[in-house]
Amino acid sequence: MRNNWNWLIFLVPFILSLTTAYTPDISVVKNKSPAREIKYFDDSSNLLVLRDEHLLISKNDGKSFEEIPDIKDPIIYFEMDPTNKNRAFAMTLSQKQYITEDQGNKWRTFEIDIFNGEMASIPKITFNFENPNYLMISNYECPEGQRLNRNCKHRYFFTKDGFKSKPNKLPVDAHVCRFAKSTKTSKIGKSETIFCTVNQLNSYGHIVESHLYNSNDFFQNKNEIKIKPLDSSSGEIIDVKIEEDFMIVVSRMDKFNEKSLINAYVSRDGENFVRADLDIDIKYGVMSFLPSSVSSLFLTIMDFNSRAFQTASFYGSDSSGLHFTKLLDNVAGGNIQKIENIDGAWIANIGVDSNNPYDGDESLLDNLFGGTYAKSIVSKVSINDGKDWSLIKLNDNSCKIEDECSLHLWDFTELDGEGKFVTGPTPGILLGVGNKGKNLAHEFEKMKTYVSRDGGVTWNKALDFPAVFAFGDQGNVILAVPYNGKKKYEAAKHFYFSLDQGKSWEKVDLEHPIYPLSILTTIDGTSRKFIIGGIDDSRRAENEYIYSVDFTNAFDGKTCGDDDFEEFVARKSNDNGNDEPLCVYGHREKFRRRKQDAKCFVNKLFEDIKVIEDPCQCTEHDFECGPGFRLSEKESTNVCVPDRKQLTQLCQSKSEITLPNKVLVEGNKCNMGDKKLEDFVSQETLKCSDYVDNGGDGNGDEKNPNQGDSNQIEVHINDFEGKLSQYQYIAESKDNNAADNVVIKTMDDRLWISNNGGVSFVRVPISDKILGFYAGPIPGQITLITATNIIYVSDDGGATFIKRKVPTQPSPRVDRAIAFHSKNVERFIWFGEECESNGRCTSNAYITDDAGATFNKLMANVRTCDYVGAVLESGDHELIYCSGQNSLDNNNNNNKNKNKLALFSLKESSSEEPKKIFENIVGYAITGTYVVVATIDDKTDSLLSKVTVDGDIFADADFPHDLKVEPHQAFTVLDSSSKAVFMHVTTNEKPNFEYGQLLKSNSNGTYFVLTLDNVNRNTVGYVDFDKIDGLEGTIIANVVANAQANEGTKNLQTLISHNDGSEWDKLVPPTIDSEGIKYPCTGQSLNKCALHLHGFTERADYRDTFSSGSATGFLIGVGNVGEFLTPMDDPSTATFLSTDGGVTWKEIKKGVYMWEYGDQGTILVLVNAVENTDVLYYSLDEGQTWKEYKFSEYKVNIYDLATVPTDTARKFIIFAENPKDHRDIQTFTIDFTNIYPRQCQLNLDDPEHDDYEYWSPTHPIGGDKCIFGHESKYLRRAKGHTDCFIGSAPLSEGYKLEKNCSCTRRDYECDYNYVRDVNDNTCKLVKGMTSADRKTTMCSKENAFQYFESTGYRKIPLSTCKGGQQFDNWNPKPCPGKEKQFNEYYGREVKGHKLFFLIFIPLIIFLATVLFVYDRGIRRNGGFKRLGQIRLNDDDDDFNPIENDQIDVVVNKIVKGGVYTVAVLIATVKTIRKIDRMMLEKLGNVIFRRSPGRRNYVSVPNDLDEEEELFGDYQDNLDDELEDAVFNQDDNLVRTPFADDVEEEEEEREGEGEGEQSNPSDERLFDIDDNEDEDEQHEVNKPTTS
């Protein structure tokens, strides 16, 4: 029995050992604040922690931390040296920095002059992998008070001895510097080779030149590297990268646009660079290089078009690094990761269209990816370097890929000891957080933790919750801490660990629950010690706890033997039952790893995992296309075809060339076996003439350097189902060059969007029927309208849409469904229809200030509403106007005005009822900063116009006296960009014979004058009126020449005005046509033979205009030369071009063509608008020469030709009918981006030596350059510089106002109620009106108290002229009986306190002053009797006044001055009396030559001495006095001195010389009559002799 108990005692410890789980050793350290950074030294137990600017060290894997006694200064950051595992750097904000070379045990200082001013960036250290003692340290130094910008200087310092001596400044002002040996595998240059880019800036901050240099002696000497076609004056080098053994130079194509496309130039030797064929719109800041190999470069291109859902494209290159292939699109958030240690293995999250992407609450994933907005996320894996992707297989019978179920991972990385996120340094063991299903779940709490043991090909569930994790001992120890996300705010109370590669897990309690911030172990993942860092669950403080977890004693520390290991072969897909591993780079990879259930550890601390490589048999996949070849887009197999772009360069000066079509991928390790190289590669001989563009016209002509290389033009074709219904460019930002988003709606209610200028389109995944879309005034704003009460709102140019529910369906009674706020994207007004049970419907307005999340009813029975306060320069910014039913009470059926349209005003944030402004209106229009309201006067039954500039006070907009506008007459507000409102009033409404008067207002929009009569309009109210963009005051209009006929066919003629409608002329026709044949216009007047253009009313797309705002002075139009405009289909119709603002024209093509401008006019494109075609014509030299380009393999019917509204892009879209199905459309995107080899050089500091020249518009009459009173100079690309593009060059900064000119007739237009007489170019009163009528009209207005006596002219608001001829003389006069109001208005009425201040205050001051002077200066000094002693000679007088202080001195001087003044006046009077009165009268007659009843003139005498004595030197001011001459007016006529008047004056002066012998140079006539004289103007009398 005793023996049994002995056995029992012996078994108890054994049983307990079986039932009690292993617990690792745990220690914890508490801190008052969380660590900013925590990193391990490589192959060490030492780690550094930065907390509150204190650097701490742990020498025992985080069990305890201690201060570093050698460091006395605050530390802003620290960095481990990747080239030396024992070295680290700690940086301060002083000149003293710290370095350790023994893994943190001891630190020393070094000094560097890097903080001599404001620090704009944290210093960055550049390392050298070949010589670790070669280092560079740099930061940006900015001018005081400025943030990081181009004015900041990047300063580099270098050391050759690892900072043992003080670093020296690199003697170059570099933008970026890199060591050639910046990677372990780099074969470029020497250990001391440095590459630097240097930007030369001008005084405007523009980059003038950008250079790339290298140096082998730290820039004591330097060598410039020339990269063709990258010229130093073209583009901007923005970065230099060393990736593996590739060197990449990244340049911005447009150095003036930070969002410009970029190019990458690749080299393997650092000397010879070739441009990579990244045929994508890469923008700086969104290109990221991923872990690459010697055989390929990998990178992602992030697309930031969507603010809610950011995606990236994944690219891989061939072994040359030059030819890239898109491997994956729509990578969600750029989340793609290379699996460590396994070549060719990648995991990525991909955004896919969701069946219901807009429903559901926002979650953590939504914040990270934007999941609720547009996309669902699925995870995929590739094991052949991205060539093929597959869903991730889960070893779960309830989730099979064939059932649309797979694993989707939110995260599959750990934080390594260096602070980087990696999949883990394990032999194929991975952990990830995600869920099974069709896509990644939005709710974080639904996710679980999964494990893979085959490199990510298949997975198993590990934990029922999401966790952060880390690997130890090559994956044999896994530590995981639960992480519940932001929604479920709960701290982790436990951690879990697995000792069998994730098969089973044990739970361990944490002494202090934490929110985990980091879990890490040694960099190589071989240690069994971990650190868990996190903050506690206290809401009041952020205490940090750092746990040290040690698994060293697990399995009693046993080290594995050979039997405990297995061979793991990577990249086994098991697809189709095939268990063979996939070969990548010509080899298989094997690993020796511990068996899953082995009870031991590898226990090889700080020893990296070893990969066993096994070569494969060579196949087609081990070869790539050779130089001059590219992969075929048509063939699915690995077929290489000649590449025209590459051959253009390779064929220089050659007639034929022989090249291998394929080459073995560099770094590939495949084994030929029984194969030969010829089995995979063939030599091909190519004729260069088949691939090199001769640049001619297609008929064998010699190359024209002005036409570029058409091989650089790219065409992208897209097919759409349904006919074209609507399209529009949407700008992404305020940058004019950023409007790359194109939205297309088809007739079948589908929507397509492109964010690359039309290169590719994506269908918007919305199942609702889309009626249309509206683009708002704010960049990126677009709203989709559906047939239901659902709308979709986007503020990122259509990259993503938010689903919103509106109160009602859109109202068919309102001509638009939505009214946008011009400044706030969150605000808009919705117009919906609400119907009652009896079928009666009303149109209501609803307002939102949260982008449609909520709505409030604004007003019922509306016609339209607008945010007018947002566009007016003054007034209430919350003001809203609505036009609607006069009575707001639907039940008030007795109101006779109920059906009339009224104008109401409301406030956005006010709950007050709408305020009625006008009872009876036709409508209102917003133009510029004016609001014009058309009201009906019920008394006179006439149409009146009211104008406001502040939304509160309305002024009458008075039409000319002879124009009465009936209520039924249409008027159209056309423009207000020139500080005046242009309006067209229809005067003839006969169908198909409509025309009217073009009126122009004064600067405040109150008085309108007739500027052009019989202006053509069409049936729907559009007018042939075009304001020319970019040129002040240039207008083109068509008039009906046979207006009196009133029936039949209109005879249209085209007129142009260069002074904002004041004067009009016909277009001067070209002398010859495009074929060199003369036009029969010689000897004919412009009335009989001129150029006429088809105008606004005949355009299929009203957005197509003659001009471009960016191509200053360029105009293109379709028309003919003759007496009248002929129909479009007339044989005489042709296309014409002007490059000088419409002064001269040339015919460029016979027939009707569509046109577009590109790159601010350096690219002109024409395409046939009538006939089916497969070609377009383009010009790169301002229309001097044209080249044909075939864009399609078949002829198509073209609907439209388009580009960005600013005409600054180099991409054009042709919308055409699909020839395969006439019900569908095609787009051809023609990309000229690469047709220019360089960007034009702009240097405003030295404009004579760049690619631009100044151009000034010239007035066609007189030929001078004074337009609107000033001479302007605009920058344009210089003639002959046709090899460069403009891009975003700020040409406006080079605009010059050369001078202000003297005023001439061209600076004036006719005043209110005056009209220009085309016969003598004078302004006359309108028919039936006199000056008295004008006074009566103006004074009859309500509250009027003044009127103006007009000369008949008023200065054009745009004119800035000075001096010269003054035609306007506005003289305000009081209306009868309104003198008191008039005087009060002008401050002339003196009464009350004003009278007291003007009279009594000065009188009191004067009397007080006199009394004071008398008392101190006269009475005290003896009174007036002593004043007689004061003589003019101060030395002889006997007056010695009392002067006790400075006041006495001043007073006595005043007394003396007064005495002297009185004495001089008395002496002067006495002298004049002595002059003979007869002589004085004679002198007066000679001077004034008076003649009774005649005008009075001043004759300048010949005696210069007398002249100077009487008048001074008159010659200096002669021109000014002549310009001051004024003129009179008749009741109906105002004459002005034009050129013919000057001739008459010269003739009269000749007559004067015959009658009198006088010096003509000294004799001048000055008319000094006032304006009331009614004698005939400019009457000149010969002076009479006295």
UniProtKB/Swiss-Prot annotation:
Cellular location of this protein? Answer: Golgi apparatus, trans-Golgi network membrane; Prevacuolar compartment membrane
Q: What is this protein called?
A: Vacuolar protein sorting/targeting protein 10
Q: Which domain of life is it from?
A: Eukaryota
Which residue ranges does the entry give as Cytoplasmic-facing topology?
A: 1416-1586
Q: Where do glycans attach?
A: N1004, N1300
Q: What gene is behind this protein?
A: VPS10
InterPro entries per record: Sortilin_C (IPR031777), Sortilin_N (IPR031778), VPS10 (IPR006581), VPS10-sortilin (IPR050310), WD40/YVTN_repeat-like_dom_sf (IPR015943)
Organism lineage string: Eukaryota, Fungi, Dikarya, Ascomycota, Saccharomycotina
Q: Which family does it belong to?
A: Belongs to the VPS10-related sortilin family.
Keywords tagged on the record: Glycoprotein, Golgi apparatus, Membrane, Protein transport, Receptor, Repeat, Signal, Transmembrane, Transmembrane helix, Transport
> Is Transmembrane given among the entry's keywords?
yes
Q: Name one GO cellular component term.
A: Golgi apparatus
> What does this protein's UniProt record list under function?
Functions as a sorting receptor in the Golgi compartment required for the intracellular sorting and delivery of soluble vacuolar proteins, like carboxypeptidase Y (CPY) and proteinase A. Executes multiple rounds of sorting by cycling between the late Golgi and a prevacuolar endosome-like compartment.
In its UniProt record, which GO terms are filed under biological process? Answer: Golgi to endosome transport; Golgi to vacuole transport; protein targeting to vacuole
Specify the protein's topology with respect to the membrane. Single-pass type I membrane protein
What start and end residues bound the annotated signal peptide? 1-21
